[in-house]
Amino acid sequence: GKRIIYPSDEWYLKAGRPIPPAEFYEDFDQLENGVGMMRLFEDEFRAELDRPHRIYGTKQIDVVTGTMAGPLITEMMNELHRQYPMIDVKVHVVKNNFFGGNVGVAGLVTATDIIAQCEGKLESGTWASRCHAAGRKRYVPR
């Protein structure tokens, strides 16, 4: 049989537990509900990092995320910088004051909080947004 109930990524992050492997999420049927999103993101990131890339010049990127994903995103961006020193990524962890400060998922961070906490700090002029379009996941530079 197939499971119908999965704990969201928040449960693992709040408990300080590792996110389960991809097999745990079966077909990622609850992805839009935040179930398995961190696992999928990390696995896609690591697969992309394993591929060779040509990078010309220095790249500066700002990444904005919520408090829950902040530590993992920071770790991943540090790994990116170690492998590609010409890429300088600054991670901005934004507290969600709009919803009372106790909601840490990045998808619920509001523009109001991003502006209030990042104004004058986003210096690169480049950011990336994860896009789920036509069933395909890709990273869209902005």
Can you describe what each PLM-predicted range is?
Residues G1-R142:
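Auxiliary Fe-S-binding modules of radical SAM enzymes
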